[in-house]
Amino acid sequence: MARIAVIGAGMGAMAAAARLAVAGHRVAVYERNGTYGGAVRRFERAGFGFDTGPGLLHLPAVYRDLFVKTGREPLESVLELSQVDPAARHVFADGTAVSLPNASRAGVLAALDGVLGAGAGERWSDFLGRAREAWDRTRRPLLEEPLWPDWQVLGRDPYPALPKRGLFGRRRPAADGTLAEVARRELKDPRLTALLESCAVAYGFDPRTAPASAAILPYMEQTFGSWYPRGGIRALADALYERCLARKVEFTFGAEVTRIIEADGRAAGVELRDGSCAEADTVVAGIAPDLLTALLKGTEPWGADDVRPAADERRRVPGRFTVALALRGPRPADAAHRTVVHAADPAAELAAVFGAGPGTLCDRPTVTVLRPDDPESRPDDDHEAVTLSAAVAPYGDLARSPATAGSGAPAVSADPRSGAHEAAVEETAALAAAADRLIEAAGAAIPGLRERVLWRAVLPPAEGESVPGPALAGAGGGFLRPANRTRIPGLYAVGGWTHPGGGLAHAGMSGALVAGLIVNGDDWRGSQ
C-alpha cells in the first residue's frame, strides 16, 4: 500500500483520490481552501442557491464510470440526475429565438429549419457530421488515453475539410483554418455562427484562433446531452467528496502546500505552510502548472520536448462574471432551464474578452441565463433563483485580484460541506454597471425581470483562477495540455490545467488517467 499525497481537492483530484483509494493506496488530500470542488462552487443566501461554476453536466458517463469503479452504488443512487429539455433556448441579436431539444440531432435540425429558414438545419447537421469525424479521430487520444509521447501527431487538425473545386474542375481540400473560418465557410448564417462561436467562448476559446477541431464542443453537447443534478452541480462535488470519505481518503482543509519534497531524484512528500511535512511515495498535483513549478522551487516538471504551458497562460483564460438573482414570483412551468441571449455585436464582444484592451464588458454581451426547476435552489415555490453569467477578460475591473479573491475565500470549518462556498463582493461602480448590463440583456429571456428582483449578488471571477477548456487537436499542438506524468518520478499532474484539459467530464477523465498510470505503471495506455 503506497502513500499518496494529493495537492488540491478539485474534481479531477478527488476523482483520482477515490480511484487510488479503491486500488488499495493510502490517500491524503491537502486543500488550501475551506472546501472541496475547485471551480464547482455554490452561493447561498436566504434560502436561495446558485451554481457559480459549471451549470450543466455533459458526458455523464465519465462520472457513472467513476462511481461504478469506486463502489457498489451507481451515480444515480446518490444523485438525482435528469436531462434538461430543451437543452437551450437561444435568443439572437435580431430577436429570433429558437429552442433546441436535448440530444436529438433530428429535433435540432427541425427546430433550426422552422425558425431560421429552410436549409439552416441541414447546414448545422452537416457541420455536426464533420464534427463527429473529428470527435471519432481524437476521442481516445484526447480523452481516454494518457498524452502520447509522440504528441506532435495531434498537431494536425482532424476536422475534415470541405472539398473545393480548383482549376480545371479538379477538387482540392480547403486549407486548415480556425473555428471562425469554419463558421463563415460552412454555416452561412450569422445566427448559426453565433450558436457555434458562443459555445467555444463558453469553454474559454476565442473562435478566431481556436482550431477547427473545436467543432467537437457543440457536437459533444448535442450528442450526449445536457444533464442537471438536483441541488445543482455542487451536489455532484458533494457526492464525489462523500465517495472519497467512504473509501477512507483523508482530507485536510486550510492546508497550503508550499513545497514538494524530493529525495533520491523523485517526489517524496509535501511541506505545508505551518512547516509540517507529510511523506509520500507519490504526489499528485491538482494545481496550475506555474504553481506546480513554484512548489518545485523552479524545477520544470516537463521537459523541452514535452507539451509545456505558456508562461502567462493563466492571464489568457477568460473568466465568468456572475450575477445571482433572487426573484419574486414563481418560475413559469414552460421556462427553459438555460437561455443564451447572444451579443448585439459579436466582434466587439470577442475584442473585449480576448483582446489586449482594459478588460471591460462590451455594451451588450452574450449572457447565459440559468433557471433550474429545482426546489433546492429557492426558499419556496413563490420565488425563483436565476443565475446570469458572461465571459470576461481574466484581468481588469471585472476580475478580483488574487488578494481580494483570497479574502473572500470561505473560512475553514468543522464541516467543509456546510454553508455557502462562494462569497459575493461589494459592488464597485464597474461591477454594478456590468451587473446592470447582464440584467438588461437577460430581459429578453425573462420578461419583467427588473421588477421581480428581490436582491442580487455580484460574483466576479478571481484573476488567474479560471480553468482552460478541453484539449484540442490541431494548430500544431498549441491547444494540447501538459501530460499527467511529469519528468520527476513519482510526481503526477491532474485537473483542468493538464491532459485532457478543463471541464467537468475532462476533469473526471484526468483523475482516471492519473490513477491508471500510478496503478498500472507509466507505460499504461488507457482502458481498452
How would you name each of these model-derived features?
Residues 189-203, 364-368, 440-500:
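A glycine-rich dinucleotide-binding beta-alpha-beta segment and adjacent secondary-structure elements
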Residues 258-380:
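Mid-domain catalytic core of redox enzymes
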Residues 216-267, 271:
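Helical element adjacent to the flavin cofactor pocket in flavoenzyme catalytic cores
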Residues 520-528:
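Active-site-proximal substrate-binding core of FAD-dependent oxidoreductases
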Residues 54, 496-519:
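A conserved FAD-binding loop/helix module that cradles the flavin
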Residues 2-143:
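N-terminal glycine-rich phosphate/pyrophosphate-binding loop and immediately adjacent elements
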Residues 94-97, 102-210:
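Rossmann-like flavin
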Residues 327-464:
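C-terminal segments that line or cap access tunnels to active or ligand-binding sites in enzymes
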